[in-house]
């Protein structure tokens, strides 16, 4: 069965360069081994990266042993739901690609919070009914 995103559709890839995902498959797939719930497809910003560094989650420094290249603003990366929510509460949330965010993220983060930072939906959906 295909993995689902927070909108109920099939989970779409998050990022191939750098190759993201807990399983390094380009998707924010999750399973029992993924204790951190790396389920949110984020488009990282400098503010988000600095926030993560301040809370002890350095996403800038490369760690080749984990196939982690280090991130720069604009990269798409599967981040943990808990750390994204903390950044959201602290006013430093990264942008979110809803179609690439695993439904398991909803166990931790309300859909409304993700939608506030979504970059894959038009700002005004009124014209979509036409």
Positions of predicted regions on the chain:
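Short, compositionally biased
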Residues: 84-107
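Short alpha-helix capping/helix-loop boundary micro-motifs
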Residues: 60-67
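Short, basic/aromatic beta-hairpin or loop at an interaction surface
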Residues: 43-58
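Extended boundary segments
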Residues: 1-47, 120
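Glycine- and charge-enriched low-complexity intrinsically disordered segments
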Residues: 103-130
